[in-house]
């Protein structure tokens, strides 16, 4: 079974006030994207990696891949106008059976998260990393006023990777874009 990681790294860093894509900011001397790609590079379940980034960042991505001698990156491809279009561009380059879609800025992904989400996808058809919500959640009425408290025991915050059978997620994206 071939497993591909699609790393979406097309952000501009605007919300955090950065003057460039946040995945190229350095932590402990290395780019955030280095740590993200490395997690998938080192994982023995991952066969190849596709990086999706902005047109102006493709060269910087290639420099990073070369600089750190990353072997599993098979494509660096241009993103789209939206995250969904960027994901679709990455999926179009993917081959094989299972695909993990992961945010390039989420550098702290663990082997267990990767391995468990792949295993759960194979078992259940799809999977995503999620963490129980610890904050107090409120629901609002149509006027925006608090209507009640949501039971946080039944809520999860979904993160990445999100894992799917490639043919299924491609079909869903095609339908969503039609």
What spans do the regions from the language model cover?
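N-terminal glycine-rich phosphate-binding loop and ensuing alpha1 helix
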Residues: 1-58
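Hydrophobic packing residues within well-ordered alpha-helices of enzyme cores
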Residues: 16, 61-65, 117
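Conserved core of the sugar-phosphate nucleotidyltransferase
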Residues: 108-178
